[in-house]
Amino acid sequence: MAALCNNLRAKLVSWQPVGLFHTGVRLLAADKDLLVKLRKKTGYSFMNCKKALEQCANDFKQAETWLHQQAQKEGWDKASKLQGRKTKEGLVGLLQDGSTSVMVEVNCETDFVARNSKFQQLVQQVAVSTLRHCQSHPENTSSYVKGFLCGDELLQLKADESLKDQLALAIGKLGENMIMKRAAWVKTPSDIFVGSYMHGILMADLPSLTNMTFGKYGALVICKDSDGNLKSNISEIGRRLGQHVVGMNPLLVGSLEDESGGETETKMLAQPFLLEPSLTVGQYLQPRGINVLDFIRFECGEEAESTESTPT
């Protein structure tokens, strides 16, 4: 018995603690300053930004890329789940730059999301991509060029990334089904101008969105100043004509010889002018030397008729 106790005592004296090692990757804690910076730049949650910095050992650029990739994957997953849900809300967006004007429509499920700056940024991305697409077309010095893009065509365009990927990111962030419905663009020579009007204007909160106009109804009116004497008033006349197109919803321009059919008239020049009902649009324009060549009208959520898609 004594020998057994001595043997046990010897083993206890000689025993050394053995360390237990975790074989997984040890994550570095997220740097607080980088966390705040990443959150502010990307708009993702603190938890996701923290996870990104931990995964990327506090490498800011890698963390930003990781966040983007994860959000895109989640966005596509969410987009497939939400596909088919009705998108009757949204915004019409208007962007003009020199001789180029574009108007786009992007739809979502609720007006609440339409008022979110992230959704407005998506509308801006669609407009900018359409603008670049339009500007890539050769100049026509004798007349204007007009084109339309449907939703499938828009998804193939790129801003910094493809609009298809941008759509997935927005769906992932905002949690609603969204569609890029349509876009129209106009490119004009120096003697033709485009009047514009937006109804139901939604004021943007972000300074980066100040070049955009958002609303529920939009119009572009393509005009020619025959006399060349209205340089200072062109913008206001164009705005009034756009307001008429939104309010009276003409179907075609018509001609000065058309007789007015009253309130049911669908030819623009023969309609009572919205802002001066005692005159037709043609009678309002004739003494001012303005010729209306064409117009485009968007109403958010309307059933869009098939429109020409060329030139694209």
Swiss-Prot record:
Keyword Mitochondrion: yes
Entry GO terms, CC: mitochondrion
CDD domains given in the database record: UBA_EF-Ts (cd14275)
Major place of residence: mitochondrion
Keywords: Elongation factor, Mitochondrion, Protein biosynthesis
PROSITE patterns referenced in this protein's UniProt entry, alphabetically: EF_TS_1, EF_TS_2
Annotated compartments: Mitochondrion
Keyword Cytoplasm among UniProt keywords: no
A molecular function (GO) term: translation elongation factor activity
GO BP term, example: mitochondrial translational elongation
Other facts noted in the record for this chain: This protein may be expected to contain an N-terminal transit peptide but none has been predicted.
HAMAP family linked: EF_Ts
Family membership noted in the UniProt record: Belongs to the EF-Ts family.
Functional summary from the UniProt entry: Associates with the EF-Tu.GDP complex and induces the exchange of GDP to GTP. It remains bound to the aminoacyl-tRNA.EF-Tu.GTP complex up to the GTP hydrolysis stage on the ribosome.
Protein name stated in the entry: Elongation factor Ts, mitochondrial
Source organism phylogeny: Eukaryota, Metazoa, Chordata, Craniata, Vertebrata
Gene: tsfm
